[in-house]
Amino acid sequence: MPALPILALALAPLLVNGQLSGSVGPLTSAHSKAATKTCNVLDYGAVADNSTDIGSALSEAWDACSDGGLIYIPPGDYAMDTWVSLSGGKATAIILDGTIYRTGTDGGNMILVENSSDFELYSNSSSGAVQGFGYVYHREGDLDGPRILRLQDVSNFAVHDIILVDAPAFHFVMDDCSDGEVYNMAIRGGNSGGLDGIDVWGSNIWVHDVEVTNKDECVTVKGPANNILVESIYCNWSGGCAMGSLGADTDITDILYRNVYTWSSNQMYMIKSNGGSGTVNNTLLENFIGRGNRYSLDVDSYWSSMTAVDGDGVQLSNITFKNWKGTEADGAERGPIKVVCSDTAPCTDITIEDFAMWTESGDEQTYTCESAYGDGFCLEDSDSTTSYTTTQTVTTAPSGYSATTMAADLTTDFGTTASIPIPTIPTSFYPGLTAISPLASAATTA
């Protein structure tokens, strides 16, 4: 077998500034893993004919390389009829340079990686993809098909330079993971709720340079979670980024989102709960640009789309929204600032600063606050935390609201009844910024 064009990676995990608590990423490089052992799925029965099931071959290759090695899926089209549970890996990498097409109909997760450490999944060509063909389910009104990718209890990991398309359910979930990095990804799903882009909970995880198209979560933090850094995110006709839904015993702290561009989505950022208990604190949401979104800054502690949970409410504190600009779809119907907190668990130490947004329809917009205390706009600055409700109506556009757009903004969604094309991964995910890390394809061809 010819030598693999493996991306040269640092031998040590990466340490970046921000809300992270330490280093992230694999402990050893793909080069060192390949030098230990290489397991090509073609040697285990895979055939790039878009017919033969790759599931068993991938499982066997994992078993052979899970104690240290690199699993290679060469360029070509592969059918996946049976799902894989890849468990117990130590110093293992998977290079996906081909395209996997869902043909099976089981629920669960097409690809589950669990109880593993020092793990990496990526494409040398930055074109490796999984096509879920979710529209086959969605056109029948079925949102209970499989997820594409789930990492569960995985530490010191990276997932990058791959494309996930049209999941029957969620696209990518990180469940109780730690010390990981996710970047240089394109996720493209159907125009329906329940088709989440990225959901993450765990500790010390960096998500950056990701584009998401769908109609539900773009990149969303769930609980429990701490020290999560999310930056350079392109929600391109999506549901938008969020936190939640939050329920009982919520424990989320040290979260930073920055450089998030949101176009034609449900919201720029939403913190959503209904009852429940626990806390969210020490969170910064800065450098947000929005255009054409239904909601902008949306904190809703009485979110009616979830069933109420027992408890006085999730306590939100020390949360800052900074440097937001752009336009919302209709500022009178859905104002750009909505901070509705629980009367029995008021929000405290909330800050809204450098916030300039204006309506695309009409000539007025509203700011609404309820039981929310802090500094800025309709927030009450008081030592008292008695319940209150206030709505401010503004008829003059704020200065500085105009913002740069992205050339790749979609002009329509992809619906739910037809196959969704596989996109390419962009090199910019926020106006004026290039990706923090170059695409793997650029590194391997340099």
Curated annotation (Swiss-Prot):
GO terms for biological process: cell wall organization; pectin catabolic process. The active site is at D216 (proton donor). Keywords: Carbohydrate metabolism, Cell wall biogenesis/degradation, Disulfide bond, Glycoprotein, Glycosidase, Hydrolase, Polysaccharide degradation, Secreted, Signal. Disulfide bonds join C39-C65, C218-C235, C341-C347, C369-C378. Residues 1-18 form the signal peptide. GO terms for molecular function: polygalacturonase activity; rhamnogalacturonan alpha-L-rhamnopyranosyl-(1->4)-alpha-D-galactopyranosyluronide lyase activity. Glycans are attached at N50, N115, N124, N236, N281, N318. Its EC number is 3.2.1.171. It catalyses: Endohydrolysis of alpha-D-GalA-(1->2)-alpha-L-Rha glycosidic bond in the rhamnogalacturonan I backbone with initial inversion of anomeric configuration releasing oligosaccharides with beta-D-GalA at the reducing end. Its main location: secreted. Pfam families: Glyco_hydro_28 (PF00295), Pect-lyase_RHGA_epim (PF12708). Pectinolytic enzymes consist of four classes of enzymes: pectine lyase, polygalacturonase, pectin methylesterase and rhamnogalacturonase. Hydrolyzes alpha-D-galacturonopyranosyl-(1,2)-alpha-L-rhamnopyranosyl linkages in the backbone of the hairy regions of pectins. Belongs to the glycosyl hydrolase 28 family. This is Rhamnogalacturonase A. It comes from Aspergillus niger. The lineage of its organism: Eukaryota, Fungi, Dikarya, Ascomycota, Pezizomycotina.
